[in-house]
Amino acid sequence: MSAYRKGNIFIISAASGTGKTTLVSRLLANHNGLRVSVSHTTRPPREGEANGVHYHFVSKEEFESLIAQEAFLEYADVFGNYYGTSAEGVNALAAAGYDVILEIDVQGAAQVRDALPEAVGIFILPPSFDVLAARLNGRGTDSREVIQRRLSKARHEIEQSVLFDFVVVNDDLARAEEDLRHIVNACRLKRSRQLGFIADLLENS
């Protein structure tokens, strides 16, 4: 966290099964000053997921009430479940100087970029479609039909990677995490992000 600047907002997107969630968890554990925006969703929790930590799990009625209140930076219906990013939560973290990670799909990323053009987009790519299919099958949580739908959607999502600022290939977790850390550090060191520090330095010279 920096006392001199508003935090960066990083949008991290990927096709399902690319390892995005694992990468974000590793980045948060090993990199100071980062916070993840906890999304709202209407889907049931998976084993090991905690409310308020992995997601804010809400009913469809609660989610639609928040939509009516314009509480989301973005939201989407994904395979029959709502997902959304709280505008208030993101803005509060960034105002406090934290860099905020939004772990969202490409549809949500486009909505956030429209609302926050300064946000930095990072897309995680699989090394191949064969590896992606193996990862989805290895989860053991989805039917064959759902997996085929996810693979079909993955192709479309990967085509949208051209709209992002950076791409990271996740063929090795440690190397992909290092790539993400380099991106975060480079964005923190932009002159436009250091104006508060420069002004304070000159004022006290």
From Swiss-Prot:
Belongs to the guanylate kinase family. It comes from Neisseria meningitidis serogroup A / serotype 4A (strain DSM 15465 / Z2491). Its EC number is 2.7.4.8. GO terms for molecular function: ATP binding; guanylate kinase activity. It is found in: Cytoplasm. It is an enzyme of class 2 (transferase). This is Guanylate kinase. The keyword Cytoplasm applies. PROSITE patterns: GUANYLATE_KINASE_1, GUANYLATE_KINASE_2. Its main location: cytoplasm. GO terms for cellular component: cytosol. Gene3D superfamilies: Guanylate Kinase phosphate binding domain, P-loop containing nucleotide triphosphate hydrolases. It catalyses: GMP + ATP = GDP + ADP. The gene is gmk. ATP binds at residues 14-21. SUPFAM superfamilies: P-loop containing nucleoside triphosphate hydrolases (SSF52540).
